A protein has these predicted regions:
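Conserved catalytic cores of very large enzyme subunits
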Residues: 89-502, 523, 527-690, 696
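Contiguous, well-ordered alpha-helical segments that form the cores/surfaces of helical PPI scaffolds
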Residues: 232, 506-519, 539, 700
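Charged, amphipathic alpha-helical regulatory modules used
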Residues: 1-110, 719-724
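Short, solvent-exposed positions on alpha-helices
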Residues: 38, 57-61, 504, 528, ...
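Long insertion/accessory domains within large nucleic-acid-processing enzymes
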Residues: 686-725
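Non-cofactor substrate-recognition interfaces
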Residues: 13-15, 422, 698
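Metallocofactor- and cofactor-centric catalytic cores in central/energy metabolism, strongly enriched
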Residues: 273, 281, 519, 714-719
């Protein structure tokens, strides 16, 4: 059995330390007020039982709370008073050096919480450690100077989650859609160097990767680009190749027919596309940003976004090459082909690629094969998105999410045209719906009252996020605000006008709708009797955002929070506050957003149809998924799922498993086992290897694919996922 020290290090539980601390306090009071030795042992026994039953490693503060409760329950109030005073004095001493222990533990690589915090960061790498060090300082400044005490308290108790405090000290935003078209067509500046319009597709791809890296270093959330912005440069290369080929033919005196000429040109164009796509794939996964990780970038593939038929045909060539290269994968250090985490791919299902016999159906088949092997692309239904994203003129719009799932709301620029690229999200605060339910004791009236109170708490926290960005000068991130990624502001100009009137969004996140409904109704939200309550909760969130937006002209929107590592924190806080409640707080995780619980048996088609109603009520972003077995030999079934997505839900993804053991060469599913301390570990089913450094494991955790492992809460959630097909 293990516990988590204040530094985050995981150590073996030692009952002697607890009994010694109690005896020290006990020895300082009058004999008549002292605990008996048998009482001390009983208190320690009870604590040990509580640690075993908790299902996760308790931290030192939890243990000390149990000690206080145990002493009080035995009526030794004088002893308790001394113990509490001792604890308080040490707390004051620690406040003098608020970050030292955390920073030292992550540098010494024994901080268990940091090791499992981010499934795309390797905490043993010095560049990642530098980012974590800066993050600890930022969190400390945020807590002590930037947040109200009650918001800090609510965050600590898992009532809300104030996201990305490790970057909040700086004036940084969350995620965005990069206006690659403006930067490539009109030129940009990167690190003080003027970059003109590229003269070939491969050069455009190379510049795009430099832009991606620069943007990633100036924000903490994900970014998205569209291949449509690269497509015009295919024809730029084509014309250049035609001129070169013509000169070569003239110089050699060869007799070439027009068909042969066209063939020669198109082969060279395809080679150019292959090189350009390869540049993006390998640059993205090998680049290291100032965040200590590869850029969190999404590549959008949408045929109907093209401006003309030539551009659409060229875009199809690029999409085909992207899918072929991702299907192949990338090699790990052992030379085995594996699934890369980035870039995330999104493929739009539309009327000319979803029906058999349609012009681009072959691309959808290739996408299906790629998903079956590599878990991407994910899918957006143009049909459903046009129904849901209606602008002020009454027109539907189709556009990418920012990163993994955060969606902008429809917006028309000053000329009355829809605008999406160049817009961004200001940040997220998430409400723990499970805590609202448990705090109400099951009383509907009290639930509604508490929900409104907690929403107002989130509102205040979101205002703090918004106000942190107010007054930010464009000089803070020239690539974003001055050189086209998001805007073309002047030097020294503030970004304030981009924070209002719908240009950017700010997100009210929510988590645990499933457990919230189960506590309040005794049933899953998939049950027809419980579903109306679940929908009413979602409507209440949207009504709050609408009210705030109308009053402040800030675009608040409801967001289905992915909770990568926070799921574990919320679960631990719920157990501490309410104990273990079957079906509600009995796991080390809570369910993401509106999702059906991972253990509930439901088929893929029913799950997607059911969740589509809730996705509609998460306009600020959400994604649904289905868990499927190895589908590489059943592509028709994947195609059936894609058609169902097209007709029923705006945004969805398929989760498969594609792992590799470097010790024995096993390819398949690396499994989750339990060690002697009850801790979940990864295990090769072939050679029983437990060394995470010698396994390549890829799992979807929050819209992105994670490859650096997860905390105990998320690992339990991954283990308990049932197949939907």
């Amino acid at each position: 059995m293990k516990i988590i020290k204040r530094s985050g290090a995981e150590v073996i539980y030692d009952r002697n330390k607890i009994s010694t601390a109690i005896r020290k306090a006990n020895g300082q009071v009058r004999e008549s007020h002292r605990l008996k030795e048998s009482q001390i042992e009983s208190i320690v026994d009870d604590i040990e039982i509580e640690c075993h039953n908790s299902g996760h490693a308790l931290n030192v503060e939890d243990i000390q709370d149990l000690v206080e409760n145990g002493i009080m329950q035995n009526g030794a109030y004088e002893v308790a008073k001394l113990y509490i005073t001792y604890r308080y004095r040490h707390q004051l001493l620690r406040k003098e050096n608020t970050t030292d222990q955390q920073i030292m533990s992550l540098l010494e690589e024994n901080n268990e919480e940091v090791k499992q915090e981010n499934s795309n960061k390797n905490p043993t790498v010095v560049s990642v450690q530098r980012d974590y060090m800066a993050g600890e300082v930022s969190k400390d400044i945020t807590r002590r100077f930037l947040l109200d005490p009650d918001i800090c308290k609510a965050h600590d108790e898992g009532i809300i989650h104030f996201h990305d405090a490790d970057y909040f000290a700086q004036h940084m935003h969350n995620c965005d859609l990069v206006n690659l078209e403006d930067m490539l067509q009109n030129g940009t500046v990167i690190s003080g160097t003027k970059i003109d319009r590229p003269h070939s597709f491969s050069t455009a791809c190379n510049i795009a990767t430099q832009i991606i890296a620069q943007v990633a270093s100036c924000q903490y959330g994900g970014q998205s680009i569209t291949l449509t912005h690269l497509a015009p440069f295919v024809d730029v290369s084509r014309k250049k190749i035609m001129a070169e080929t013509t000169e070569l033919i003239k110089a050699t005196g060869l007799q070439v027919s027009s068909e042969q000429f066209d063939y020669m040109v198109e082969q060279r164009v395809k080679d150019e596309i292959k090189r350009g796509v390869q540049t993006i794939q390998y640059q993205v996964i090998t680049l290291m940003t100032t965040n200590g990780q590869a850029p969190f970038v999404t590549v959008f593939m949408y045929l109907n976004e093209a401006k003309n038929e030539q551009e659409k045909a060229d875009l199809a060539l690029i999409i085909e090459e992207v899918l072929k290269q991702r299907y192949q994968g990338v090699k790990n250090e052992k030379g085995a082909w594996i699934t890369p985490a980035f870039p995330k791919l999104i493929y739009v299902l539309e009327n000319d690629n979803v029906e058999q016999g349609s012009p681009y159906y072959y691309l959808s088949e290739l996408a299906a094969k790629c998903t079956a092997r590599r878990m991407v692309p994910d899918y957006i239904s143009e049909k459903k998105m046009l129904e849901l994203k209606i602008d002020a003129k009454g027109n539907g719009n189709c556009y990418p999410c920012m990163g993994c799932r955060s969606f902008l709301t429809p917006y028309l620029d000053l000329t009355g045209k829809p605008k999406y690229y160049g817009r961004f999200n200001q940040g997220v605060v998430t409400l723990n719906l499970v805590d609202v339910a448990c705090s109400s004791g099951g009383d509907m009236m009290k639930f509604n009252q508490l929900l409104q109170e907690r929403l107002e708490l989130c509102h205040r926290a979101l205002r703090i996020r918004h106000e942190r960005l107010l007054g930010t000068k464009s000089d803070a991130a020239p690539i974003l605000w001055q050189n086209g990624a998001l805007a073309r502001l002047k030097k020294g100009e503030v970004i304030d006008k981009l924070l209002y009137n719908g240009y950017s969004t700010i997100s009210l996140g929510y988590a645990g709708l499933c457990e919230c409904v189960r506590y309040m109704t005794g049933k899953s939200h998939t049950d027809p009797d419980a579903k109306p309550f679940a929908l009413n909760v979602m409507k209440a969130l949207n009504e709050a955002c609408k009210k705030w937006k109308e009053a402040e002209h800030i675009d608040y929107s409801v967001y289905g929070t992915p909770l990568e590592s926070t799921t574990y924190k919320f679960a631990k806080c719920l157990k501490k506050r309410f104990g273990i409640i079957e079906g509600v707080t009995d796991k080390n995780y809570i369910t993401n957003s509106y999702h059906v619980n991972v253990t509930e048996k439901i088929d893929a088609f029913t799950k997607l149809s059911f969740e589509s109603e809730f996705q509609r009520l998460s306009p600020g972003g959400a994604v649904s998924y289905v868990e499927v077995p190895n589908m590489e030999n059943n592509i028709p079934a994947v195609m059936a799922l894609l058609k169902h997505i097209y007709n029923n839900i705006m945004y969805a993804e398929l989760n498969t498993k594609s792992d590799f053991c470097q010790k024995c060469g096993y390819t398949g599913e690396i499994q989750i086992a339990t060690d002697g301390d009850g801790k979940l570990i990864w295990e090769c089913p072939n050679c029983k290897n437990h060394d995470q450094a010698t396994m390549n494991v890829a799992r979807r955790t929050c819209g992105y694919i994670g490859t650096q492992y997860w905390n105990q809460g998320r690992t339990q959630e991954i283990k308990e996922r049932v197949l939907h097909l």
